[in-house]
A protein has these predicted regions:
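Carbohydrate-interacting/catalytic domains
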Residues: 2-185, 190, 211, 216, ...
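Short acidic/polar active-site loop segments enriched in Thr and Asp
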Residues: 66, 222-224, 364, 545-546
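Core domains of carbohydrate- and sulfate-ester-processing enzymes
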Residues: 110, 114-171, 234-254, 259, ...
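Hydrophobic faces of well-ordered beta-strands that scaffold small-molecule active sites
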Residues: 183-185, 224, 291-293, 366, ...
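Generic recognition of stable, solvent-exposed alpha-helical segments in well-folded globular domains
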Residues: 208-211, 224-225, 272-279, 291, ...
Length: 719
């Protein structure tokens, strides 16, 4: 067999095989002519389409197909100008590969048609009339502008483009922050800047987000977690409710896993479709901010048996999806189908996809939506050691990627604290969210659990193995109330979603502080502001990585909607006018993020303090009452260790009073020559650049904590 079958193309205009052949005085020649196109077998180990000196190599695999036709389209055309049936002799194993001479990437788009058996009971859905998207497509055409009907209307087909890989990353370097040092800022690319109040050009795009990097850097976060940015169909299930157009806004319905979402690009660059995203990632990292992608490998946009067939269904339906014995789709995702993640073919596909984003886009990690689905076998049963999770944990390219699991699924599997990890996987700690929400709003009987969560959830994450670096602590995310709404609404208000308020979580553990929704009552608003500050103080004094939702730092609201997946409007968009209205909250959040950065003991163990104090100690709050008592609402935690540059001991006391009356707390004793200084009191209004009543404590044995407030004290040397 000719050597060219097995060589990889480089990312330049020529392939290594070209150079090798030229050095031998040989060139690659066509072997056949099909429909006027010179062709030869392509590059079998390079899935997808790649430009070469001679033309373009196309490679696609199917276990069940009996034939494969390559379709070539002029840009934006709906009908192909060429159909090239790939010869059976060009098929090795289950892989079709063909090199078409003379093609230039900018001149065409492509798709496939496959024939084979059609038997739904066996999960076989081959139909030679279906136009199929390349699973490895690096760019997808057809939905260029957000919310517009696809090109071609009801006859629309997805097509792929060949993308040039020549982006200049400059002096690129990995930031490689420790997991527990992360402060993660979860955001929706469109919603972050789409509202005119953002003040950027190209709002709702990667470019719009890029213009907000100075804001993010000043805030102090060191990682962004981008909600789905793979090509998705916002028009899926689009509908009008009360005169308002609703979309599949969040994007958890992937169309193409290797391609960035077309409508998120402000600059549409043919054959360089990913460059705007790459510029964003490059500048984020130049400013000290890692990039984590929210990825959806639990289901696809093809839906169930009533859904469209544009990719996996027509290529190998019974391999890519989990099917019941009678050929229907399991639905552990709640979205119509489930990817068969532990089938060897799908396992390789997922690994290849993540490698692509790690290499081509230089991302730093991935958050896996409904990750417990990746732990199910091909019949849907949970596995003790799922092959796909193990493969990703030990993959050589993904070796320094951050892997974060949403450790549950819609089928009832809940694995927070027990997700298979190989000491590589972290988890969204849903129990942190629930226990801390309960304590912060004043519930009884949860103080002990709150202390466990703040100090690293050792009941779930064994300090001898993963420890608290595996616990991604959060109080809010895209799914649920915003932080402001958590203290403004007792009940969800999802009526505008069109489901009679039946969708969304019914147990958000929220409290409206006495008035449902917006109010001008100064007492209510003062309490809400204080509770938001308490939440930031607790989150940023908790051991392990921290995460919050974009806009929480200036009290962005979704008006009580806790499931805004379909709202492409001010309900989901950030209202940057609130930054001025809630400047104090922003400044407090910024202060706490920077305070956490200056004091490593707040987020992880450091070298032991020379003075001999333990890394973490728990202190009684009310005299003669232990924090484990059912009715206590007062907790105190002291952290001790070495400071950031290992030049001195560092000691911090965190105290929280969730009770509705002021309470006194006993302060732990300090070593000789140290005294306590009050640096945070959430009862007081914060002024940027001025510590919260920063002063030496007159009484070094106790501190008065106002009702529903937090205090933080820092040990200082005596003068």
């Amino acid at each position: 067999m000719n050597a060219s079958f097995w060589n990889y193309p480089s990312k330049q205009k020529s392939w290594p095989i070209d150079e090798e052949m030229e050095s031998l005085g040989e060139v690659i020649h066509p072997l056949d002519n099909i429909g006027g196109f010179d062709v030869r077998p392509g590059f079998y180990q390079m899935n997808g389409a790649y430009q070469t000196e001679e033309g373009v190599s196309f490679t696609v695999s199917s276990h069940g197909a009996t034939s494969c036709v390559l379709l070539l389209f002029r840009p934006a055309a709906q009908e192909p100008y060429a159909r090239i049936r790939i010869p059976e002799s060009y098929k090795i194993g289950n892989t079709y590969s063909i090199l078409v001479f003379g093609l230039k990437a900018e001149d065409f788009e492509y798709a496939y048609q496959m024939d084979g058996p059609a038997d739904q009971a066996r999960g076989l859905l081959f139909n030679r009339k279906h136009t199929l998207l390349d699973p490895y497509a690096k760019a997808v055409t057809g939905q260029r502008n957000w919310g517009e009907k696809p090109e071609g209307g009801k006859d629309f087909v997805y097509k792929a483009r060949v993308v040039q890989s020549d982006f200049d990353w400059g002096r690129y370097r990995n930031l490689n922050y420790k997991f527990e040092d992360l402060v993660i800022y979860e955001m929706h690319v469109r919603g972050f800047t789409k509202d005119a109040s953002s003040g950027v050009k190209g709002g709702g795009t990667f470019e719009g987000l890029r213009q907000k990097i100075p804001y993010l850097k000043d805030l102090g976060i060191n990682a962004v977690e981008l909600m789905p940015i793979f090509e998705f169909d916002e028009m899926e299930s689009a509908r009008v409710v009360d005169g308002v157009q609703l979309y599949n806004y969040w994007g958890y319905n992937t169309v193409s896993f290797f391609a960035p979402n077309t409508s998120y690009a402000f600059h549409q660059e043919h054959n360089h479709e990913g460059d705007e995203l790459k510029r964003l990632i490059r500048e984020l990292k130049e400013n000290g901010i890692e990039v984590i992608l929210d990825v959806v490998f639990n289901h696809t946009a093809e839906g169930n048996e009533n859904g469209p067939c544009f990719c996996f269904k027509g290529i190998d339906n019974n391999i890519y999806y989990m099917l019941t014995p009678d050929g229907y789709y399991y639905n552990f995702s709640g979205c119509g189908n489930v990817l068969n993640c532990n089938h060897p073919v799908v396992r390789r596909f997922i690994t290849d996809c993540l490698r692509h984003w790690a290499v081509e886009y230089r991302v730093d990690g991935f958050r896996f939506d409904l990750a417990s689905i990746l732990g199910r076998d091909q019949n849907g049963a949970p596995m003790e050691n799922p092959p796909i999770l193990e493969a990703l944990a030990f993959d050589s390219i993904l070796g320094d990627m951050k892997l974060i699991a949403e450790a549950w699924d819609a089928g009832g599997l809940y694995q927070v604290g027990s997700f298979p990890s190989w000491n590589r996987w972290a988890e969204w700690n849903g129990r942190y969210r629930d226990d801390m929400r309960s304590f912060l709003k004043g519930d009884s009987g949860v103080a002990g659990r709150a202390i466990t969560r703040i100090t690293g959830s050792s009941d779930m994450y064994d300090p001898a193995s993963r420890g608290y670096s595996a616990s991604v602590n959060f109080l809010t995310c895209h799914d649920g109330f915003t932080l402001y709404d958590l203290y403004s609404y007792n009940e969800k208000h999802n009526e505008k979603n069109g489901w009679n308020n039946t969708d969304g979580d019914n147990n958000g553990m929220s409290w409206n502080c006495g008035v449902e929704g917006e109010t001008d009552d100064p007492a209510v608003m003062g309490l809400r502001r204080r509770l938001v500050k308490n939440a930031f103080a607790a989150l940023l004094c908790s051991r392990g990585p921290a995460m919050f939702f974009a806009g929480d730092e200036f009290c962005n609201t979704q008006y009580g909607n806790n499931n805004a997946y379909c709202q492409d409007n001010i309900i989901s968009w950030l209202d940057w006018n609130r930054l001025e209205e809630f400047q104090e909250i922003h400044d407090f959040a910024r202060f706490m993020i920077h305070f956490r950065a200056k004091h490593p003991i707040l987020r992880r163990d450091t070298k032991p303090a020379v003075c001999g104090l333990p890394s973490v100690s728990i202190h009684n709050g009310e005299p003669n009452r232990n924090y484990t008592d059912y009715n206590t609402h007062l907790i105190g935690i002291m952290y001790a260790g070495r400071n950031a540059d290992d030049t001195d001991d560092d000691m911090i006391f965190y105290g929280m009073n969730a009770y509705w009356e002021p309470l006194e707390m006993r302060l732990p004793s300090l070593p000789e020559s140290y005294h306590w200084k009050l640096v945070v009191n959430t009862f007081c209004e914060y002024q940027d650049g001025v510590d919260f009543e920063a002063q030496t404590q007159g009484d070094q044995t106790r501190v008065r904590v106002p009702e529903r407030s937090t205090v933080i004290l820092l040990a200082e040397h005596d003068l």
